[in-house]
Amino acid sequence: MAFDFGNANDQQKEAIQTTEGPLLIIAGPGTGKTFTLVKRIVYLITERGIQPEEIMVATFTEKAAKELITRTTNELYKMGVQVNLNEMYVGTFHSICLRVIKEHLEYTRVKKNYRMLDQFDQKYMIFQHINDFRALPHYEDIFTKKIGTWKQAGEIAKYVSNLLEELVDVNGMLRDSNPATVGMANVLALYQKITEEENLIDFSSIQTEAYSLMLNHPGILAEIREKIKYVMVDEYQDTNYIQELIVFLIAGESENICVVGDDDQGLYRFRGATIRNILEFPDHFIDGKCKRVDLTINYRSEKEIIDFYNDWMTSTDEKFVWKNFRFPKKIVPGKKDYSSDTRVVKCSGKNGVEDWYDSVYDFVISLKHQGVIKDYNQVAFLCKSVKNDKVINLIQYLEAMNIPVYSPRSEMFFTRPEVKEILGCLIMCFPNYFLRLKTESFTYSYPDLYRYYREECVEAAQKLIKAHKDLKKWYENILRNHSQLKSNTDYAFTGILYQLLEFEPFRGYVGIDIGSGVTDERAARNISILSAVLGKYEYLHRVEVFSEKNIISAPEIFFNMYMRFLFEGGITEYEDDSEYAPSGCISFMTIHQSKGMEFPVVMVDSLSAVPRTQSDGVIEEIEKKYFHRPAFEAKEDIKFFDFWRLYYTAFSRAQNLLVLSCYEKNGIGRTPSKYFESCYSTLPSYNDVDLSKMELEMVKPVNIKKSFSFTSHIELYENCSLQYKFFKELGFTQIRVGATLFGTLVHETIEDVHRAAMRHEESTITPDNVRAWLDTNYLTLSKSEHSYLGVKQVDAAYRQVIAYVERMSNGTGLTGDGAVTGESLWSHIQDAEVDVSLVKPEYILKGTVDLIRGDGNTVEIVDFKSEKRPDLTERSEDFERYKRQLEVYAHLVE
């Protein structure tokens, strides 16, 4: 039966069918890139006979990976092809590299129970060690200008991430004659020492660790190459040096590499990405071997919009020349019935910023009243930053005029009423801190923060306490306890938060129905985020309860230090991957954030911007000597290249109407700047164009399947649907009530035993080695969980593992009640810690099987439990739960 190409055009068909050897797909905006990728994966599986697990697909974001998985599995499901997603290497570079590390953990510097650092965690870890960094030789040569401690931590995080991804020679840098270079080498060396000692891993070191693992262990690399026969990379224009190395290392001599991207949409230089990867991709192969396919037929935008952004890329007004730093291309409309009406306009304010606010409002509301806009989510407002006062004031203006706005990255978290109310109530629960806050009697002065606490948070809380008698009674009781605390409480910050949720208005906030809409759910989502902030602080500072020792210090550190960093840096509000443009709201987002999206109406702001050189003398000096590739573009051209690419990306998000918007201004801060003058000045104002008959497309729903597992979802829902809503749907942080160390320790050590058996190293499964594995696991586990076992408990865990080892070694089976065969059962182990999944039309069911074993055609599924064995004759509730779990796993394995 012939392959179903769907609506693929000739360009797309060529890309889909070119499966062998290197392939470069240049995919312009709206040209069906994801459609082509999905069809290519399906073609490989169904037409070329490639197993799904032989394909690796690296995406730029987790959301893109989820969408790709959903669309691919839907296609395969319709064709009757079953896929175990966990066998496929699909995800971001970071998630794929992390999987490689996990599968071969014993060969890396990373140990079990490592802690992943996000961007804030990384900065905070550096901040906690800042005195160690400052004591390094030549540290002062890096930071010649005085900046605050938190900013220094941020700069160090940026530097080490960049240098790690470029694989610089630290030892060579230490011998350099430039003091700043030596200082940077010392910083990098200390950073690596700390992360190794504390068993930490960040986003950059995930990639370098995976690369080092494959490079230094030929056997592991050969195993990975045996698995992965085809490599595909999305958004290749935004990859960096280490990612390119990983791609070519995995692909090996087969060179079955397909990279997809658009050199005109390369936006992430500030994160270490380089456009050279996509432009120089064909140069890695002998002449003529790399095939290039250009996707240039745009199915997204109206013709006038396409012409507008085509002209933007080619009309550089003699300010610069692209030379060889882009692939020449012309995007053409794919819509057969495109409109001949005006589809690019401007929306201006001529008499100050307030006049501009009025113009934006009038533009939106007139289209709504005319019935052109059916849903506010058809409009998106794009700008360089959603954090500046001008944009935030516009958001607040529109909301005051009853136009809801969705802008989770505008850092408005601390302006939300529910956040102020919760923080105010928390502050008032600590009488010593509250008293000192009134007079700012602290060692360090942070007047803006203290003013926010007093005038906004505490005032909001006092109004609530006055209005709600039950809340007032609770507050008076906790205040009395904290004023004369004699014994430990059974709660910390998170516990107080959850006590508050018993009272109005907080109970009403979290009692909202899921699916009510982003604005209705916002309060519940923000309180959930606050629970994560509190939980993270409690973990990092080991605050499990309040006591006489910490009732004074813990609140001060939390409010004046930890929260200060978040207050100054901002907290992103909740974003739903499955709904990038929530119904009923105008979306405000950065141009970077909008990448890969499309909207019927796009308003582009930030027209006062000009190309700016971003330079860092210290890094530039290191780049010249220690990066493995010389600089690619000329330094003086980079600012123009990046500027033009940024706004090309913005303009090309529009489907039906593109609007350039600003308040016009002359003199300093001229708006629009001269770089937009030629394209802006010729545009008609929206007032001068009849838009009433324009037909807008509706926002396309994002098709992302949700994943569910037995223990994390099904079992939790069966036990308590309210807990499921709270912890899984709203994402609240669970209070740490002491880790189940014993069971985890036994489980992890048995996993070590299984790994040795699967490597055919049964001779290493000795009592001494088992004890060594258990001791190592206990060390990392106790450090990770901040919890400890007594010597007798550790010994008991060891005895459980040894008992299992003896049963497997002498053939009595897993439970010890089988016949003694005298033959080892290690060879019966087929796999351990197996991730399995089952794809359904509406969801994905996942699970992790502890052990799959069998002899001949038999297969046994084993799930280890460290608690007391249930009475099998009485069929207890525990027994029934275990039975259901194994039935689900059996279903997945089948």
Predicted regions and their residues:
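Accessory C-terminal helicase-associated subdomains
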Residues: T181, L200, V372, D470-Q593, ...
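P-loop NTPase Walker
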Residues: M1-V110, M116, G219-A222, G252, ...
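Conserved helicase NTPase motor core
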Residues: F5-Q17, G21-I25, T36, M56-V57, ...
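Conserved P-loop NTPase-based nucleic-acid remodeling module centered on helicase motor cores
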Residues: E54-K151, R276-E280, K725-F726, F732, ...
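Conserved RecA-like helicase ATPase core segment
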Residues: A2-N7, V42-T46, Q128, Y241-C347, ...
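ATPase/helicase motor core of nucleic-acid motors
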Residues: H284-D287, T342, I365, H369-E504, ...
